[in-house]
């Protein structure tokens, strides 16, 4: 008889739940819930389990916030809960709550070539460290290492490191944003709002008045080539995305590859392919030859968070990935 576990990927707007086959990691019966329709994560889980009528005793939920203790408070929603209390309330034998990019990193060993698009480099070295990052509402970062036949995710808040300007143009951008924001993190550039920040800073650095644009406006005008400032912003976004990925590669020697997740890049994929992304990734001065063979992949799987939550849980239960 097939045994299932509950897996989830929860953000500020949507909570996506699914079943994961414990033996092989297959994800099925995924369903997306609006977080605005429920008072708590537990209420969403109960609604889902009531529909599926499965005997579930194990769960793993990925959430877009730091996970440091039993008590979890979402940063982009008002849900807060005790993991141990939720586990008891649901009568689960185990319940894991992990960071969303911990889940994405754990998906890497489960991905097939059909769910990856390569941008330069050669082939990934087996069992070598991996880096994962992605721009969306924020900038998520994680690393993955292989130790004693187990994959270990190294989560953190790498999206909040300082933005490092590396050209005269970027110096001007940093000057404008520092005046507005004080501390300028990488996430202030590499995110949906970051794209708007880039556009605004480009215009203001030229002593002009920017329009009140949304991220989608900047992207659409850039792709339609109807706004030079928007096109410059999107081009700079791709370059800085490459440079940031190259920094991650240097940090841990990620010869297992650097993987891009998140919802922004697929919206302008052809533009991204033709951009200065890969050149910026390799632009490491004396260490250009070091990073040159490291492959970069865009994850195209529909549910990497669910896949990774399942992988994390299965490994916790003793399965070898």
Swiss-Prot record:
Its EC number is 2.7.1.2. It catalyses: D-glucose + ATP = D-glucose 6-phosphate + ADP + H(+). GO terms for cellular component: cytosol. One of its GO terms (biological process) is glycolytic process. Keywords: ATP-binding, Cytoplasm, Glycolysis, Kinase, Nucleotide-binding, Transferase. It comes from the Bacteria. The keyword Heme does not apply. GO terms for molecular function: ATP binding; D-glucose binding; glucokinase activity. The keyword ATP-binding applies. ATP binds at residues 8-13. Its main location: cytoplasm. It is found in: Cytoplasm. Gene3D superfamilies: 3.30.420.40, 3.40.367.20. HAMAP family: Glucokinase. Belongs to the bacterial glucokinase family. This is Glucokinase.
């Amino acid at each position: 008889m097939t045994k299932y576990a509950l897996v989830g990927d929860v953000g500020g707007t949507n909570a996506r739940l699914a079943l994961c086959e414990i033996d092989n990691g297959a994800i099925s019966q995924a369903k997306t819930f609006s977080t605005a329709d429920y008072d708590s994560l537990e209420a969403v889980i109960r609604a889902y389990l009531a529909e599926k009528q499965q005997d579930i005793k194990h769960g793993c939920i990925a959430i877009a916030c730091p996970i440091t203790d039993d008590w979890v408070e979402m940063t982009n929603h008002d849900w807060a809960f005790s993991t141990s209390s939720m586990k008891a309330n649901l009568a689960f034998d185990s319940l894991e709550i992990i960071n969303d990019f911990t889940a994405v990193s754990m998906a890497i060993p489960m991905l097939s070539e059909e769910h990856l698009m390569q941008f330069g480099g050669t082939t990934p070295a087996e069992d070598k460290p991996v880096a994962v990052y992605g721009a969306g509402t924020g900038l998520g970062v994680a690393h993955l290492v292989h130790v004693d036949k187990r994959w270990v995710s190294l989560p953190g808040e790498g999206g909040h490191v300082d933005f490092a300007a590396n050209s005269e143009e970027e110096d001007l951008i940093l000057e404008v944003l520092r005046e507005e924001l004080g501390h300028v993190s990488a996430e202030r550039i590499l995110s949906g709002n970051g794209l708007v920040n880039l556009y605004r800073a480009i215009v203001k650095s030229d002593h002009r008045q920017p329009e009140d644009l949304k991220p989608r406006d900047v992207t659409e005008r850039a792709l339609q080539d109807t706004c030079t400032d928007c096109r410059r912003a999107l081009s700079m976004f791709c370059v800085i995305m490459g440079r940031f990925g190259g920094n991650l590669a240097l940090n841990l020697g990620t010869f297992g590859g650097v993987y891009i997740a998140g919802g922004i890049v697929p919206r302008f994929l052809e533009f991204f392919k033709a951009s200065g992304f890969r050149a910026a990734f390799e632009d490491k001065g004396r260490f250009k030859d070091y990073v040159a063979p490291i492959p970069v992949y865009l994850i195209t799987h529909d549910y990497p968070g669910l896949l990774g939550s399942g992988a994390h849980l299965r490994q916790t239960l003793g399965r070898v990935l």
